[in-house]
A protein has these predicted regions:
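Beta-loop-alpha module in the N-terminal Rossmann-like domain of NAD(P)-dependent dehydrogenases
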Residues: 15-77
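NAD(P)-binding Rossmann-fold cofactor-contacting core
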Residues: 1-12
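Contiguous beta-strand/loop segments that form the cofactor/metal-binding neighborhood of enzyme cores
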Residues: 124-194
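A contiguous active-site-proximal alpha/beta segment in oxidoreductase catalytic domains
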Residues: 67-132
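Short glycine-rich anion-binding loops that position phosphate/pyrophosphate groups of nucleotides
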Residues: 38-41, 90-91, 173
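Short, flexible/disordered intra-domain loops and linkers
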Residues: 1, 39-48, 176-183
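Short loop/turn motifs at secondary-structure junctions
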Residues: 29, 56, 108-113, 140-143
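Short loop/edge segments at beta-strand edges and connector loops
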Residues: 21, 62, 87-89, 146-148
Length: 194
């Protein structure tokens, strides 16, 4: 589904797929829709488009970030229309992230203790950052000891997750006219072991 621009027409032609200009044109026998359009959290209509698909009984993967109220609304429509909803998981499938998580699992299984985490991310990619972090430490309670005031584009946080100390650098700045760009940092992780 696209607005029918020259770019979307060329894309559909290149991949040999039909181009629909509204969700209502999409046949009901489609299994899943991947919605890579900004959600309401970023001023877009990706959530509304997702809900239109869900109302048709078509499962949806929606690109992050998504506000928690929008997620709840999408789950409600998925449940009532007997289909599935999830947010995208792009970063967890990147080779570098998979390799890091694999090494972390290997060390954990060998009994090597994770001593400290130094990490950073941006507001645009914070949801997947938290997901990756959760997989590094296998969940747990977060204890924030200190959150700095905003310094330029960044904030810092210090604390621990179930006893594993951390320091996070967070790029807390987004250009409202171009929210997909201008990140100073995407994801960075430095893990210290015994």
């Amino acid at each position: 589904v696209a607005r029918g621009s020259e770019r979307s027409q060329k894309c559909a032609e290149h991949y040999g797929v039909p181009l629909y200009e509204s969700v209502s044109q999409v046949p009901s026998d489609i299994d899943i829709a991947c919605v890579a359009i900004r959600t309401g959290a970023l001023g877009g209509n990706g959530t509304e488009i997702s809900i239109e698909f869900l109302k048709k009984g078509i499962s949806v993967i929606l690109e992050q970030p998504v506000h928690h109220k929008e997620i709840a609304e999408c789950f409600k429509f998925a449940r009532s229309n007997n289909c599935c909803f999830m947010t995208g998981d792009l970063y967890l499938n990147m080779p570098e992230i998979r390799r890091m998580l694999s090494v972390t699992d290997y060390l954990r299984n060998k009994g090597v203790k994770l001593e400290y985490i130094r990490a950073g991310s941006s507001v645009q990619a914070f949801y997947p950052f938290v997901d990756i972090l959760n997989r590094l430490v296998r969940g747990g309670n977060v204890n924030l000891e200190y959150v700095s005031p905003q310094r330029g584009s960044f904030k810092e946080a210090i604390g621990d997750i179930s006893g594993t100390p951390f320091s996070f650098e967070f790029n807390n700045d987004m250009n409202p006219h171009d929210p997909d760009n201008h990140m100073h940092i995407l994801h960075t992780f430095t893990l210290y072991y015994e």
